[in-house]
Amino acid sequence: MSTAVMWLLLFVVVALGILIAALSKTKFTTQKIATIGIMAALSFVAYEFFRIPNVLGTGSSFHLGNTFTALTALMLDGVSGGLAGAIGLALADIMAGDPGYAITTFILKFIIGIVCGVFAHKVFKLQDLSAADGVKYYVAVIGSAFSGLLVNVFTDPFLGYFRNRYIFGQEADLASTVAKITSGVTLINSLLSTVCAVVLFLFLIHISEPT
């Protein structure tokens, strides 16, 4: 697939993401937009400077970029978390000259944020809990953070297979092998990002509580 078509697909994906965000019931205040921007920047930095790139030549990397997708979803909501991760990490791919990767990155990170947000605020109702609730609270925080990152263990290699097969033109056997390796890499990333997101969330909640 030509680079021009990749850029066109990326534009369509980003436009759809923005449309979904606009059609959602999410209220975007100035403070929330600023927070999304900061978290997107932190996602970019975490990916660019805290990663082991191109594991086994697959194009996948060990990194902590997903931390801030989950963290934003826990702090705000799923759409905000999805936008923060999608913007920050897709931008990292664009800066690296990989619009093909940016297409799937935007979709995957948006999904992570949405799932984390649903579990945090709809399933566990994290906004109604506090450290005083003990184990229930910590299970809710960990479960919410890990939910979206666990989904990514399956969606990343799945979308990655079709990206490598039809955008990059890899042979089916090679694309399948890369997808299997990617699944393992993504699992490790998910575990690391869950730990980081949970620790950061608990720390931020602690320091924001009135003394």
What are these regions (language model features)?
Residues M1-S208:
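Loop-helix junctions at membrane interfaces
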